[in-house]
Regions:
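Residues forming well-ordered secondary-structure scaffolds
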Residues: 87, 105, 126, 143-150
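Short beta-strand/turn micro-motifs at beta-sheet edges
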Residues: 117-120
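A generic structural motif
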Residues: 134-139
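Mixed-charge, glycine-accented linear interaction segment located at domain edges/termini
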Residues: 140-163
Length: 176
């Protein structure tokens, strides 16, 4: 699966009324607690990959993300599977993987047609908006990305507002 994703900084109180007006439906609220891992043999910050255990509502999901595929969005291969978070972390630690950092956020999730809209309140960082389309085929990347930017234009947002820095990088930058 390829996630086609655009992230922007956004005041949620300005976004919510527009979402309501366009008839977007709320599909969930998640308290996400993410731990990112660093491999002993490869610097994921340099290779632009990610290895993460996400804990939410009593269960955990393991995620691999590949390098970003374009210059304007956060489009990339994403592989996810449910796991036992505690056991998986123990396995990683045993193999010499270190924790690179943690990100905690509250995510309000909406659906507007095919587009998944996330209102993220990230601990220590503030409010963000992420919009996402998942595609199977690389040939659909460009049209999906265009669709996301067209969607964002309804909020007065454009390509120049797109942030490609990850929450983890922002958390780490703030810490240093
Ligand atoms: P998702 O969209 O899957 O819910 P998210 O929105 O919580 O994730 P993002 O900021 O979109 O978080 O993506 C996580 C990011 O963390 C990835 O872009 C990845 O490249 C980055 N990352 C992972 N490991 C490292 C590392 N060691 N150093 C710097 N960045 C990393
Ligand atoms: Ca995503
Ligand atoms: Ca994201």
């Amino acid at each position: 699966m390829i996630e086609v994703e655009v992230k922007v900084r956004a005041d949620h109180s300005k976004i919510r009324p527009v979402l309501m007006e366009m008839g977007a439906s709320k599909i969930g609220v998640e308290e996400q607690s993410d731990v990112y891992f660093a491999a002993p043999y490869r610097d994921f910050a340099k290779t632009d990959e990610a290895l993460r255990i996400r804990s939410l509502g009593g269960h955990s999901v393991l995620t691999y993300k590949g390098p970003k595929l374009d210059k304007v969005s956060k489009t990339r291969v994403e592989i996810e599977t449910p796991v036992d978070g505690t056991a998986t972390a123990k396995i990683f630690h045993s193999l010499g993987f270190l924790e690179a950092g943690a990100v905690r956020k509250k995510r309000d999730i909406f659906r507007a047609g095919e587009i998944i809209v996330c209102l993220d309140a990230v601990e220590g960082l503030g409010e963000f908006l992420e919009v996402e389309l998942d595609v199977e085929d690389k040939k659909d990347l460009e049209s999906s990305r265009a669709e996301l930017f067209k969607f964002l234009s309804q909020f007065g947002l454009s390509e120049k507002d797109s942030i490609r820095t990850s929450y983890l990088e922002m958390v780490l930058e703030k810490r240093n």
